[in-house]
């Protein structure tokens, strides 16, 4: 059984790796967004509290997010392992998460950091295009993913589009947020002896292979 935390800057491939691991190991995927939506759908007291904040257009307080997470971890489906997506985002959340684990009788597991140079991240973000029809992802800076014909999907011939926030300005904002809030978690988990760094600039296949080795150890 493994509980995983994935730490990565925007564009490092965290989402792709997470999806592949979920498919292979039948882990539970836990993201704060899905967690809150799931709780609202249940319609219990906690779900009603969350809904009130959402309707008012306010951020859901951390204490309520923690409560929802603790409820989720009590689910037997998590016994086989789970991947935390987008949490914790800072030291405060990491410390509270460990208190939740202690109360839930679960282990911290392993923390995987996807390491990649900033210039490579920029190319991954600004060069990324997605097919409107089949969802296939292309990248104009990648020999493997580059569209043969400009603006046309290699897989189905559909039109390629780019997300509005896949630009340098948006990337810099997200990257700075990562450096200020999330990156300090690297030293935090390194001191706890649970941190593992993968050079994800080597490509997705290499990244997945290394992650699988960590899980099997």
Region roles according to the model:
Residues 1-217:
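Glycine-rich phosphate-binding loop of ATP-dependent small-molecule kinases
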């Amino acid at each position: 059984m493994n509980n995983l935390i994935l730490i990565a800057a925007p564009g490092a491939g965290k989402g792709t790796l997470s999806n592949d691991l979920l498919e292979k190991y039948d882990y539970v995927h836990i993201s704060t967004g899905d967690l809150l939506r799931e709780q609202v759908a249940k319609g219990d007291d906690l779900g009603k509290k969350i809904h009130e904040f959402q309707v008012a257009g306010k951020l859901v307080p951390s204490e309520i997010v923690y409560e929802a997470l603790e409820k989720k971890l009590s689910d037997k489906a998590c016994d086989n392992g789970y991947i935390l997506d987008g949490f914790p985002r800072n030291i405060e959340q990491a410390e509270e998460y460990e208190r939740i684990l202690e109360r839930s009788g679960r282990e911290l597991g392993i923390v995987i950091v996807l390491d990649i140079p900033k210039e490579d991240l920029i190319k991954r973000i600004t060069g990324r295009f997605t097919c409107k029809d089949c969802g296939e992802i292309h990248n104009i800076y990648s020999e493997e993913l580059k569209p043969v014909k400009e603006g046309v999907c290699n897989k189905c011939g559909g039109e390629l589009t780019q997300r509005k926030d896949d630009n340098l300005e948006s990337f810099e904002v997200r990257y700075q947020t990562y450096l200020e809030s999330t990156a300090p978690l690297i030293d935090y988990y390194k001191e706890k002896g649970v941190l593992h760094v993968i050079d994800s600039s080597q490509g997705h296949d290499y990244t997945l292979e290394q992650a699988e080795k960590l899980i099997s150890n």
